[in-house]
Amino acid sequence: MKDARRAALAALVCAVAAQGASPVLVRGAADTRALTILQSELQRNFQTLKQQPSPAYFISYTLHDQRSTRLVASFGAVDSNDESRNRFATVEVRVGDYDLDNTHPIRGDSRAMGPRVTRVALPVTDDEQPIRLALWRATDRTFKQASEALTRVKTNVAAKVKEEDPAPDFSREDPQTYTGDTASYSLDAKAWEARLRRISAPFAEDPLVFRSNVSLSVDSDNRYYTNSEGTQIVTGDVACRLFIQAVTKADDGMELPLYQSYFASSPSGLPDEKQLIADARSMMDMLARLRKAPLVDPFSGPAILSGRAAGVFFHEIFGHRVEANRQRNVDDGQTFGNKVGQPVLPAFLSVVFDPTLRKLGNVELMGHYLYDDEGVKARRVTVVDKGILKTFLVDRAPVKGFTRSNGHGRAEPGYVPVSRQSNLAVESSKSVSTEKLLDMLRDEARKQGKPFGLLFDNIEGGFTNTGRGSANAFNVLPNIVFKIYTDPSRQPELVRGVDLIGTPLSAFAKIVATGEKVDIFNGICGAESGGVPVSASSPPLLVSEVEVQKKAQSQEPPPILPAPRQVEKS
């Protein structure tokens, strides 16, 4: 998911704590001194810039106060222990008016757009004069860049044919005021180092595991947002993430990675050390099985995607295509651009995005937030209702027919917000038991004259291309796949070496049923506005036809030298 129009590998991240040394989440009343400084300097600068020949009509300041702790261990030893604290502001200035401003796409030369925002480092303390000086310099620079960009925009608009989508460049939204608690944490790093050593140690027992690590990241982010329309937002969040990964290699040189992830915002939702060690050993067992698993040739036929795999599938091939900014871009494929009010999925499926949800069942969702990165209140959005496309995920850059944001303008700190996904949920009115779904898979394989169907049990991520310049296709990267034979007496067979490929409209049309048990994918999605936390939940999907291709394969053989024997500890 690095860029939705380019390779965009999902970087799954997770959070964990254990008994005795859990990171402690601390919430306190918001310190509004930083917000007061931002507001004062913003108003001072806005009063001057709105009087210029090409006047500024909008300014926003976002201050992020961040602290991060990252611990990494591999094969029973600590690799790194890093602590950081930083504070910075992102300055946006818009010149022109709500209908046409400096952010308007320049058709035929996207490189001519220039920078939209300026990121500037700030003191980590609330020293007013240094902060104001930094904001003043950044605002002046951003205004000059915006003024030059508006000149290019007006020239481009005059020289090109009339646009298909004449929507305004910026939506008018109601000012919001919200002052939430700020967040911080305390962490016993030494205790966690010992814990990560123990969790990572089992991988040293297998000499064919070439790379492995266990990483813990604990991050706090206190955000202060204000704009010239009167919006003032203060929010604070802490995220604890733990990531277990290991890589082995088959005899033919194919690298076989596996990942396990956990996420929580407080210790109460996190597994203990015993469970984590058990998960690490289960991963080792699966790696050993994968080394011996046969390769699969390119195949076209029926398949089941597990709930988690289906979540990634929908995130990649559906979610990116309903982000409104892709409907504005003339270079985008605009898969659903003119399909509002029309069927785009089977009638038994609905898709919602709900950033207001903190949990689904007992699982915390990474895509939760109260206000988006443009200061708009988060809300539940039903994008597809019983198969019919109803709307898009909209930020403050409207598209034809949708003139207001629905709270999905998102960005990694320091980037320009665009419409992005939050907590995706696939809902089905045609669900069956796991046993019935497997029977339906076998029946579909028999009908097509296939000896087996496929079960995609786990997916590490994927990428999708939504542009017009190349195939409007997706590539999803499974790492645990089984053959399900039409003969029910034959056990499922673990296989390796395939990627799931296809085009979106064809794939959606071939979903024929779903299972009952909903599973959840939590991860970081990267696109134009950087990496943002998301989740995707779905029941298992039965698809009448999928296509798989051979996975890219390393030509480097396994090591010739034997691995050193494990050191006996007295």
Residue ranges of model-derived segments:
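C-terminal, non-catalytic macromolecule-binding modules
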Residues: 388-444
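Short acidic (Asp/Glu) and glycine-rich catalytic loops that position anionic groups and cofactors
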Residues: 175, 258-265, 415-422, 484-493
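Local beta-strand/beta-hairpin segments that build beta-sheet-rich folds
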Residues: 383, 390, 493-495
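Short clusters of small/polar residues that mark proteolytic maturation junctions
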Residues: 258-260, 394, 495-499
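Active-site bordering "gate/hinge" segments
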Residues: 20-380, 385-388, 401, 452, ...
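N-terminal secretory signal peptides that target proteins for export/translocation
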Residues: 1-4
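Hydrophobic alpha-helical bundle architecture
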Residues: 427-506, 522-528
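Bacterial N-terminal signal peptides
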Residues: 8-19
